[in-house]
Amino acid sequence: MNEIGISLDTVWMLLAAMLVFWMQPGFALCEAGFTRSKNTANILMKNFVDCMFGSLLFFFIGFGFMFGGDILGGFIGMPNWGDLSFYEGELPVEGFLIFETVFCATSATIVSGAMAERTKFSMYLVYSAVISLFIYPIEGHWTWGGGWLCNDAADSFMMSTFGDVFHDFAGSAIVHSVGGVLALVGAIALGPRVGKYSAEGKSNAIPGHNLAMASLGVFILWLGWFGFNPGSQLAASGEVNRIAISHVFLTTNLAAVAGGTATMFLTWFKYGKPSLSLTLNGVLAGLVGITAGCDLVSPIGAVIIGLVCGIVLVYAIEFIDHKLHIDDPVGASSVHGVCGILGTLMTGLLSTSNGAFYGHGWGFFGAECFGILVIDLWAAACGVVLFFGIKKLHGLRVDKRIEEEGLDVYEHGEMCYN
């Protein structure tokens, strides 16, 4: 590749990293808006921690775990201890590290909202460190790190079993479903907020304090997704990359608007009025769903994925809240977990190059099913050990009095609103 091409690709990758980083304030505003004002400083602090811890730990160790040479039979990569010389890609390693770091921070941040309003800040620090250091880099090594789930050698497990490899272009499974599964396990370990469920098991609504803030957060996340998905092409020079990036931009936006539209009309039909809060999550559901196959599906396929995710989201939130009695204040387990899984599976059906619905057989769909199963079982197992281990050893939840009065003053000694 010539110098101009490498320079253009590098600039595009760094610009995309900036957009993905901008998703952090999007998550912060969205989560804060969907929760009560007495916990806003705590929500914002946790989002800063995810970014700070994620950046440091991924630089020193996680980057090597994810992209280093295979050890332990390919289960994990060789830790780098802050040394970046092992990386052999064409693009500058520093730029690639930054791009991958903001993805790691995104996966960590997803859990914050599901565990909002009742988690000890000190124990959240432990979780944030473990996902950035261990959980995310290991499953990332199996996939984007060139590991066994994406090994296309003829004699590899995936090729010999399914005739295809697992595909997740920008992270429906690797980033979002992992965060969503961890969010669900964390919410289960914590238990519901005080007053969320009556003695008879009826779910009581606990409204967030600022839907305007949440709306702004979703718009910022939507913008950030234009770095998250198109940026995963990791190149912009040449006709192939120009076309690929443009296609991913289009499919990403179509899925977002389809998801939001489906949720808006469904809530209008079910509840008599279109719900703003659920429509916001519907947009995110479409974005999460398209992230795995935004490079492979057609524009019509993107609309279908968005519509399905926007509809399923509503029923997933109801089921988790009303039937399972799991208190997820922002719906993270439904948006990122359920829709991340759904989008990955639908990629296996709707991919124009090897999808089952395009006459290419069921091998690729099988690879997608197996990949998402392995990745989310890993996340669930780690989440159970981590959250229930913390709960047993140190306690995961604040005292009832602190929860009722708000975490801002007791955990941080200050409030966002005076």
Residues of each region from the PLM?
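Glycine- and aromatic-enriched membrane alpha-helices
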Residues: 1-418
